[in-house]
Design a protein with these regions (language model features):
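Generic structural signal for well-ordered alpha-helical scaffold segments
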Residues: 62, 116, 120, 146-147
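A glycine-/small-polar-enriched, mobile loop at the entrance of the PLP active site in fold-type I
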Residues: 75-80, 93-112
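Conserved N-terminal alpha-helix of the aminotransferase class I/II PLP-enzyme fold
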Residues: 102-135
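PLP-dependent class I/II
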Residues: 3-7, 21, 25-42, 46, ...
Length: 437
């Protein structure tokens, strides 16, 4: 006779128990195969959160590649370059020096000082180290921010199309994401009147992401000033995600909204990290710069959740911020070359189009001209069916726009080599041509 062993918390129930070992904390039951147990209940809070569609698509493409299929993946939200050598060497050196113990929960002082210097040098912002909280990636920094600032029912304006995690992070903090859709004809930028119309007496904050994922737009200084005026007038917090700040093209300029006035600085949480500019997505180092009382609240929260970020990754991040930026410049130049080619190829395909992005490494491809057409009798009804049909028939992975709140678009990343861009867009052309009315 076969048996299954499962752990049941004290007070749990299971049928068909043959033998029990009881401790103060738990009971171990050995059950006969096929016996039923009560399913653990998932909290309503967790049930309200959906998975990351971008990560799901990327995982699906990698799984297909592992099976030997020739998949062209345009889903990745990470540079395809290696972490620069001087950063890798700094991590090796930290290991050799035994820098493997706890650091302060909010990050080591040396790194926080380097972040302050970076903000002064590149953004014209003055912060003290105690105003910096280093976390396990910029996503974790955003998580801490919303946890520190939101109470149940507080509303957060999220411009759409938006990065998939913004609404979910707000929900996880008990807040209510209020999405306001920008239009392609306005370069996917919200107008001040759109933002003003979305403000209610429950509005607590607005999210800004410039340069933007998934659209690639970059707000100008004047546009940011207009948004800042609304924030001041309605006493709103600005959550400014600036993770793509160095990845700008065609003369676009990244401006941190916190640098526009002392009043805006006091109501802005600056979010940034190492992942995109330094090809360090797996190292997981992000940070916030904020008013001191907010930084203290986030530090307390983090001290009971993850404690400090990885110590070796912190030493690597210190080298990134204080070392040479030659590879960054080369990476931006290569992204620009790929960007121009991808835009050219997309706009040459009947039924598809895109606006040239000014930042990040994404293109939002408009699929409106193909909606309603069919492949072997199966209609393209929106971004999800487009994505599924394209992946199944041509082995090209893109991210459906529905995950960004824009169902008539799909997102393509040009953080891949030029060969893949040429091959993948050729397959997309074939796919579009194969669709029938």
């Amino acid at each position: 006779m076969g048996y299954n062993a499962i752990i049941v918390p004290a007070g749990g129930r299971a049928r068909g128990m043959d033998w029990t070992i009881q401790t103060a904390a738990m009971r171990l039951h050995i059950l006969k195969k096929g016996d039923a147990i009560t399913m653990m209940r998932i909290s309503k809070r967790c049930q309200a959160v959906t998975g990351s569609l971008t990560l799901e698509i990327d995982a699906k493409a990698k799984e297909m590649k592992a099976r030997g299929l020739d998949v062209v993946g345009f889903g990745a939200g990470e540079p395809d370059f290696d972490t620069p050598e001087h950063i890798r060497n700094a991590a090796k050196d930290a290991l050799d020096r035994g820098m493997t113990r706890y650091t302060p929960a909010s990050g080591m002082l040396e790194l926080k000082k380097a972040v302050c210097e970076k903000l002064r040098r590149d953004n014209g912002l003055s912060y003290q180290p105690q105003q910096i909280v280093v976390s396990n990636g910029a996503k974790h920094s955003l998580f801490n921010t919303f946890q520190a600032l939101l109470d149940e029912g507080d509303e957060v304006i999220v411009p759409g199309p938006y990065w998939v995690s913004y609404p979910e992070l707000v929900v996880m903090a008990g807040g209510v994401p209020v999405t306001v859709q920008a239009q392609e004809e306005n370069n996917f930028k919200l107008s001040p009147s759109q933002i003003e119309a979305a403000v209610t007496d429950r509005t607590r904050a607005i999210v800004l992401n410039s340069p933007n994922n998934p659209n690639g737009f970059v707000y100008t200084r004047d546009e940011l000033k207009a948004i800042g005026d609304i924030a001041i007038r309605h006493d709103l917090i600005i959550v400014s995600d600036e993770i793509y700040e160095y990845l700008v093209y065609d003369g676009a300029e990244h401006v941190s909204i916190a640098s526009l006035s002392p009043e805006l600085k006091e109501r802005t949480i600056v979010i940034n990290g190492m992942s995109k500019a330094y090809a360090m997505t797996g190292w997981r180092i992000g940070y916030t710069a904020s008013p001191l009382h907010v930084a203290k609240a986030m530090t307390n929260f983090q001290s009971h959740s993850t404690s400090n970020p990885n110590s070796i990754a912190q030493w690597a991040a210190l080298a990134a911020l204080s070392g040479p930026d030659d590879q960054l410049k080369n990476m931006v130049a290569e992204f620009d070359r790929r960007r121009r080619r991808m835009v050219e190829l997309i706009n040459g395909i009947p039924g598809l189009s895109c606006k040239p992005p000014k930042g990040a490494f994404y293109v939002m491809m408009n699929i409106s001209g193909l909606i309603g057409k069919k492949l072997d009798g199966v209609p393209v009804t929106g971004s999800m069916s487009f994505t599924e049909l394209l992946l199944e028939s041509k082995q090209v992975a893109v991210v459906p726009g529905i995950g960004f709140g824009a169902d008539r678009y799909v997102r393509l990343s040009y953080a891949t080599n030029m060969e893949n861009i040429e091959k993948g867009l050729a397959r997309i052309r074939e796919f579009a041509a194969s669709l029938q009315d």
